[in-house]
């Protein structure tokens, strides 16, 4: 009798990339990155340079939100609007700095990893993606594009 093991590794389009070629790719890349973060480490492709840069955004999240682990554990991830409002208590929507934009991405990626599933995302980890999309706009994507490259 042989054991049946899953060998599926989630590997999004931008995971192995070193940089983005167009501002139009930022939203898609960030969406893939948060989704990728929802998988267990052994079930996702190793990060290339671009995703390594995105992983470093967790440092910005620590600077802005202080204790992101406790924040992630205690936020109501089943309610996207409430999570966005909590983040807005730290970071108002008007004219976010590059560190604040990075911190939002880092916080949501941390939440996706914390609440993620073994071989697929959970509803809470997907909501971390929706929170990020709720918080960022086209101006933010333009700003973060420069940091990602």
From Swiss-Prot:
Transmembrane segments: none annotated. InterPro entries: Poxvirus_B14/B22/C16, Poxvirus_Bcl-2-like, Poxvirus_sf. One of its GO terms (cellular component) is cytoplasm. GO terms for molecular function: molecular sequestering activity. Changing residue 130 to K: Disrupts self-association and NF-kappa-B inhibition by B14. The keyword Signal does not apply. Keywords: Early protein, Host-virus interaction, Inhibition of host NF-kappa-B by virus. Signal peptide: none annotated. Disulfide bonds: none annotated. One of its GO terms (biological process) is symbiont-mediated suppression of host NF-kappaB cascade. Belongs to the orthopoxvirus OPG200 family. Contributes to virulence by binding to the host IKBKB subunit of the IKK complex and preventing host NF-kappa-B activation in response to pro-inflammatory stimuli such as TNF-alpha or IL1B. Mechanistically, sterically hinders the direct contact between the kinase domains of IKBKB in the IKK complex containing IKBKB, CHUK/IKKA and NEMO. This is Protein OPG200. It comes from Vaccinia virus (strain Western Reserve). The gene is OPG200.
């Amino acid at each position: 009798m042989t054991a049946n093991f899953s060998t599926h590794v989630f590997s999004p389009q931008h995971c192995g990339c070193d940089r983005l070629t167009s501002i139009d790719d930022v939203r898609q890349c960030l969406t893939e990155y948060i989704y990728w973060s929802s998988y267990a480490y052994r079930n996702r492709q190793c990060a290339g340079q671009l995703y390594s840069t995105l992983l470093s955004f967790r440092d910005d999240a620590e600077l802005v939100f202080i204790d992101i682990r406790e924040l992630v554990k205690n936020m109501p991830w089943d309610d996207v609007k409430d999570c966005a409002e909590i983040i807005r208590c730290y970071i108002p929507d008007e004219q976010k700095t590059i560190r604040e934009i990075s911190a939002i991405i880092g916080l949501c990626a941390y939440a996706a990893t914390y609440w993620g599933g073994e071989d697929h995302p959970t509803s809470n980890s997907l909501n971390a993606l929706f929170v990020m999309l709720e918080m960022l706009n086209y101006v933010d994507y333009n700003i973060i594009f420069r940091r990602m490259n």
